[in-house]
């Protein structure tokens, strides 16, 4: 299957794929969910939950980075961080892979479409815990949402298998993000509807357009199995399949893509020779220092202690999560497991951990912890480790964007 065919497989299914850039109302302060009471969602129907969204800013009359990258005029734009010649069309036009701009949610009790092992992207801001099923994101790549009062873009790039969440607030604006139809290093390139600046999904930096050089703030995302997230957040919210689009949710439009012997689509750089292109790694970056933890090492050890920019971390792995990029049905995908990265400190006391029965036990108190860093039994029950931003991705992508990355070795 060609790269264009793969990308188009995730595109039209009843819609024409044309960009839809609606003028929004005046910018204002973010609207917290549920009219300021995010702990008590408003239920509109059994299982369905109503959440309020931030007010997005108006479209601005500025030169378009999106147009420039597609062969248009570049007059009036700052020097791009990435030569437009390095951007590749994935096939679909802008928003041909349609983002979800008006997300609907269901309660945990209302979910009947996820298997225990299906991957969900977990976000928790101020106790507002949400799960975004990869079976939905694989078809849309971006959800413009508001979580814990923060306007958030929850993003997923299938070609890099990378999940990242970004604050949509930029210079007093609240942005709305779409898919540009372009790729850089085989990774999703987003654009904002307010200025049509292009942004790298992988590092959150504006690369072509009026906001070139601006960086988005990130929030931690963990890709975990539905069963683990459900048990940890019985009162949480789950992105609904009621997206307004006709897609075959639960199926994988990129079957076989994650084969270790395959090559990434539309990646024209040289792959760092330390691993093959499609080797899975956990990527961590703190203050410019980067570390890749190979998944094979995590499979062997379960827990890998790490230090990045002087910060001690603990990196975890448990089995039980299906690959979304393997079989035609996501639920049938190979068990690649799931990861978590945390600061291993509680009340100033450093902890070390040992894998145990699908969770972890700290060696200091004997408390049991789940994959989301919550103590579920023992003296520290109810405590939460500080999560650290990380990305589960392929080596070709991590090493392309972080060429100076170190690699974790066996303990």
Language-model-detected regions and their locations in the chain:
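Mid-to-C-terminal functional-domain signal that highlights helix-capping/loop sites
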Residues: 17-411
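Short, conserved catalytic or interaction motifs in soluble domains
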Residues: 13
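C-terminal motif of bacterial Sec signal peptides marking the signal peptidase cleavage site
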Residues: 7-10
């Amino acid at each position: 299957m060609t790269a264009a065919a793969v990308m188009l497989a995730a595109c039209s299914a009843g819609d024409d794929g044309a960009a839809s850039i609606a003028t929004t109302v005046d910018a204002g302060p973010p609207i917290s969910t549920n009219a300021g009471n995010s702990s008590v969602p408003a239920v509109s129907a059994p299982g369905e939950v109503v959440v309020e969204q931030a007010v997005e800013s108006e479209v601005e009359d500025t030169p378009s980075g999106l147009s420039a990258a597609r062969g248009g005029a570049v007059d009036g734009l700052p020097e791009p961080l990435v030569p437009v010649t390095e951007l590749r069309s994935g096939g679909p036009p802008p928003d041909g892979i349609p983002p979800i701009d008006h997300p609907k949610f269901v309660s945990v009790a209302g979910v009947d479409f996820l298997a225990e092992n299906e991957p969900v992207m977990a976000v928790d801001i101020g106790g507002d815990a949400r799960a975004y099923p990869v079976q939905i994101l694989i078809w849309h790549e971006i959800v413009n949402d508001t979580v814990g009062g923060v306007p958030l873009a929850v993003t997923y790039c299938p070609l890099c298998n990378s999940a990242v969440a970004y604050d949509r607030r930029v210079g007093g604006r609240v942005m709305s993000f779409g898919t540009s139809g372009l790729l850089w290093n085989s990774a999703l390139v987003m654009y904002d509807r307010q200025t049509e600046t292009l942004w790298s999904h992988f590092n959150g930096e504006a690369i072509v357009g009026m906001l070139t050089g601006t960086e988005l703030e990130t929030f931690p995302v963990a890709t975990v199995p539905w069963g683990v997230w459900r048990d940890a957040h019985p009162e949480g919210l789950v992105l609904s399949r009621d997206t307004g689009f006709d897609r075959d949710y639960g199926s994988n439009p990129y079957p076989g893509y994650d084969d270790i012997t395959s090559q990434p689509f539309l990646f024209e750089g040289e792959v760092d020779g330390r691993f093959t292109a499609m080797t899975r790694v956990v990527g961590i970056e703190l203050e410019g220092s980067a570390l890749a933890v190979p998944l094979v090492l995590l499979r062997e050890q379960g827990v890998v202690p790490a230090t990045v920019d002087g910060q001690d971390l603990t990196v975890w792995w448990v089995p039980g999560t299906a690959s979304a990029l393997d079989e035609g049905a996501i639920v049938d995908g190979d068990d690649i497991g799931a990861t978590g990265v945390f600061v291993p400190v509680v009340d100033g006391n450093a902890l070390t951990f040992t894998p145990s029965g699908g969770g972890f036990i700290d060696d200091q108190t004997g408390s049991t912890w789940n994959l989301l860093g919550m103590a579920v039994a023992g003296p520290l029950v109810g405590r939460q480790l500080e999560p650290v931003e990380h990305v589960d991705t392929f080596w070709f992508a991590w090493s392309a964007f972080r060429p100076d990355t170190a690699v974790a070795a066996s303990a």
